[in-house]
Structure formats: C-alpha cells, structure tokens
C-alpha cells in the first residue's frame, strides 16, 4: 500500500508538473517559459503561414502583433513589410525578451520594437496601426468584446485585424487543453464574429481549414 500510495503521489506530481509547464502557453515564465516560446515558434509555423496567406500586406505598413510569444510572427511581418514598422506586444516578460532576441537586427535598424502590455488596455494611441494580428492567443484574452474594442481603437480606418487559431471550437479533443490550462477558452468562428461585430468591426471574413480544425478571421475596421 505504501508503494501504491507513492506511485499515486508520483502520478499526481507528474500531472501537476505537466500542467505547470503548459501554463506557459498562457503566460511564459522562467526556463519553462523560454522553452515554450521556442516550441510555439516552430509548432505554430504552419498555422501562421496559412493565416498570413489570407491577407496581403502593404510594404510600408505599421503593424502590431498582440501576444507575440517567441517573436516568429514579428519576423514574418518584418519580411512582408520591408519599409514598414512592426511592434510586438505580450504581457509576459519572457516573451518580450525572447521576441527581442529573435528580432534584434530589426530592432537595431529601428524597424521593430517589442513592449510588455495588456490587450485589454493597449498602450498605444487611437488609429496607430494598419494591421493588428493575434496568433494562437485570443483563447486567453480577458473579455473578448473589450479586448477587440481596444484592437479596433488602435487600428487606422480600414485597418485589418487578423486572428488565427488552431482550434475552431468544434473538435472535442481540443477541450483537454482547457482542462489543463487555467483561463483558456476555445471559441467558435460564430462567437468570434459576434464579438468582433459588437466591438465595431464592419467587414468580417472567416476562413477555415476543416482538416486541421484551424480558423482564421480577417476583420476590417
């Protein structure tokens, strides 16, 4: 019985350790957080590529990538907007530092900066950006309409908000993540579109990859 008890305790500890590690998807912290940002950069690459294929970007655009994680999508934006400027924002210090590291050359050239900030109170003036992107992050946003309204505020007139999620809310298997990660909520495209409309977006296009249960939404101010 002692062996059984210690085995059960070990299983609980392992489960808790795994859950602690996956909490880093919400807010990367410490060494586990650094590791997670690198995993995000590689693990989300195909999704990001697909999401980016749904928009065309002006080469001189002013861009904000919210929830920038490890900074890989900042790098893609920089490549697409060679004469523009890209800002990354995340509420995790680890993510900010990792994104700065990955995009150090562009930061040195004055084409990029990465800031710590909260999407429910974006630290920028009205009508600052041509594009705002959110890859694999809206699951964790505290109140969609409020956060989407903030995105709407910082976008210029006819500015574009790109959302990209690898869970479309129709795959029961994805619910395991909401049990594992505190504060995570998976939305359907219908729910996202309703919140975007309420936040003041006018033209909203949805794209889906049914095979992978991916969704991408392009909303115009």
Name each model feature, range by range.
Residues 1-13:
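Single conserved hydrophobic/aromatic residue that forms the stacking wall/gate
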Residues 15-41, 45, 160-218:
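C-terminal alpha-helical "lid/dimerization" subdomain adjacent to the S-adenosyl-L-methionine
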Residues 42-61, 76:
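Conserved alpha-helix/loop element of class I SAM-dependent methyltransferases that forms part
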Residues 55-57, 80-81, 155:
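A generic alpha-to-beta junction signature in SAM-dependent methyltransferases
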Residues 62-121:
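Class I SAM-dependent methyltransferase SAM/SAH-binding core
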Residues 120-131:
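A short acidic, Gly/Pro-enriched loop at the edge of an enzyme's catalytic core
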Residues 131-144:
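A short SAM/SAH-binding and catalytic strip from SAM-dependent methyltransferases
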Residues 145-157:
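A short glycine-rich, Lys/Arg-flanked "PGG" loop and its adjoining helix->strand segment in the class I
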């Amino acid at each position: 019985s002692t062996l059984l008890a210690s085995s059960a305790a070990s299983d609980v500890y392992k489960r808790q350790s795994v859950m602690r590690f996956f909490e880093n998807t919400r807010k990367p912290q410490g060494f586990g957080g650094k590791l997670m940002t690198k995993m995000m950069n590689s693990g989300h690459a195909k999704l990001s590529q697909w999401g980016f294929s749904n928009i065309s970007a002006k080469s001189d655009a002013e861009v904000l990538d919210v929830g920038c994680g490890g900074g890989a999508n900042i790098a893609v934006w920089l490549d697409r907007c060679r004469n523009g400027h890209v800002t990354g924002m995340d509420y995790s210090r680890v993510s900010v530092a990792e994104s700065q590291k990955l995009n150090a050359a562009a930061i040195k050239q004055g084409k990029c900066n990465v800031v710590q900030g909260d999407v429910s109170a974006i630290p920028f003036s009205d009508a600052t950006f041509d594009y705002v992107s959110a890859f694999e992050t809206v699951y964790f946003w505290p109140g969609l309409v409020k956060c989407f309204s903030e995105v709407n505020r910082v976008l210029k007139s006819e500015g574009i908000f790109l959302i990209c999620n690898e869970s479309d809310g129709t795959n029961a298997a994805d619910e395991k993540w909401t049990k594992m990660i505190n504060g995570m909520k998976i939305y359907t495209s219908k729910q996202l579109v309703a919140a975007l409309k309420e936040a003041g977006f006018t033209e909203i296009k949805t794209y889906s990859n049914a095979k992978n249960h991916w969704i991408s939404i392009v909303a115009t101010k």
